[in-house]
């Protein structure tokens, strides 16, 4: 089987490039595509959108239509699927899932698709393994890392940035 994995940022891509081969094994293939943020689902699902904007949800209707048209030509013995990985952020899960399925239901043909929604930000995965953070960032701030409560809803990207980035989340936010 082949997997096309869409993720909202570069850090998610780096993590999935390492994790996915361990999950799917050698008999399957995959590509991870990162975007410059999650964005918003467009009101007009048929709109073309600006391809230069690499914003995940803004591009999703066109991406899913393209994957549907491509995957229909894959051999039956080697199917393909799209996996969308993104954060819930401040959205209502029930409404957000319905919006994603509304996009998928406009596709003809419809690609095999799974929506993987992190209730808290994906950075919570990283904060769940403090020794790995310390191995990658030996100068990471212990006080910040030790104050994090695993699986808490607390602004995890800010916590991770405060631990590993010079100037913390305010400095990173200032960069855009």
Where do the model's predicted regions map?
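C-terminal accessory helical subdomains adjacent to catalytic cores in phosphodiester-
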Residues: 2, 13-176
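Helix N-cap/beta->alpha junction signal
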Residues: 8-9
